[in-house]
Every structure is written in structure tokens, then in C-alpha cells.
């Protein structure tokens, strides 16, 4: 069980801000989560072997191969409009401002 002060500290560390009416809901939900974690911590798992795969299949591995991964020219070929040439010269996309 955690206290309201601990819940408020956790919210502050996570940079969460709550209105007065939602603080109680946050505290209740966080307290429930912590209680569930406590229940899981009480389970004795020392005689249980770890599960590595649900369907017990082996992954087919491939050899690593060094390849060229510079796709910038191919991506910039898709730029259209007035900024296409400039985008190819500076090698980045030019977009309208979306955040003010």
C-alpha cells in the first residue's frame, strides 16, 4: 500500500499534473497496481522452469550481411513541389511548420 504523498511524488517525477478531482482516481489506480505487484511477488517460482517459447519453435537465423543502407537519395526522389531540389541538396525533408 502506498500513501497519497508517495503517489503525488511519483506523479511529480513522471511530470504528471492532475486536477484536484482526478488525484484520488490516480491514487486509487496506482495503489491497485502496487497491490497486484505485491501479490505477484508472493508467488513461489523457484521450481518453475522459465518458458522460452510458447510454441517451442526454433527461430531460423540468417547470416549477417553487410549492405549499404543509405536510402536517402531514393527517399528524397519522392519529394515533389518547389522544395524538391533544395531537399536533395541539403538531404532532409522541408515541411511546413506544424507546431507553434
Swiss-Prot record:
Cysteine pairs bridged by disulfides in the record: none
Coiled-coil features, chain-numbered ranges: none
UniProt keywords, alphabetically: ATP-binding, Ligase, Nucleotide-binding, Protein biosynthesis
InterPro entries for the chain: Asp/Glu-ADT_sf_sub_c, GatC
Gene Ontology MF terms: asparaginyl-tRNA synthase (glutamine-hydrolyzing) activity; ATP binding; glutaminyl-tRNA synthase (glutamine-hydrolyzing) activity
GO biological process, one term: translation
Family the UniProt entry places it in: Belongs to the GatC family.
Its job: Allows the formation of correctly charged Asn-tRNA(Asn) or Gln-tRNA(Gln) through the transamidation of misacylated Asp-tRNA(Asn) or Glu-tRNA(Gln) in organisms which lack either or both of asparaginyl-tRNA or glutaminyl-tRNA synthetases. The reaction takes place in the presence of glutamine and ATP through an activated phospho-Asp-tRNA(Asn) or phospho-Glu-tRNA(Gln).
Protein name per UniProt: Glutamyl-tRNA(Gln) amidotransferase subunit C
Record gene name: gatC
Amino acid at each position: 500500500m502506498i500513501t497519497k504523498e508517495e503517489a503525488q511524488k511519483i506523479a511529480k517525477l513522471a511530470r504528471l499534473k492532475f486536477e484536484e478531482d482526478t488525484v484520488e482516481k490516480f491514487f486509487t489506480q496506482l495503489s491497485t497496481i502496487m497491490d497486484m505487484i505485491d501479490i505477484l511477488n508472493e508467488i513461489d517460482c523457484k521450481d518453475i522452469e522459465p518458458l522460452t517459447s510458447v510454441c517451442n519453435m526454433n527461430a531460423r537465423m540468417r547470416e549477417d550481411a553487410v549492405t549499404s543502407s543509405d536510402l536517402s537519395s531514393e527517399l528524397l526522389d519522392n519529394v515533389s513541389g518547389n522544395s524538391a531540389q533544395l531537399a536533395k541538396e541539403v538531404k532532409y525533408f522541408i515541411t511546413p511548420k506544424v507546431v507553434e
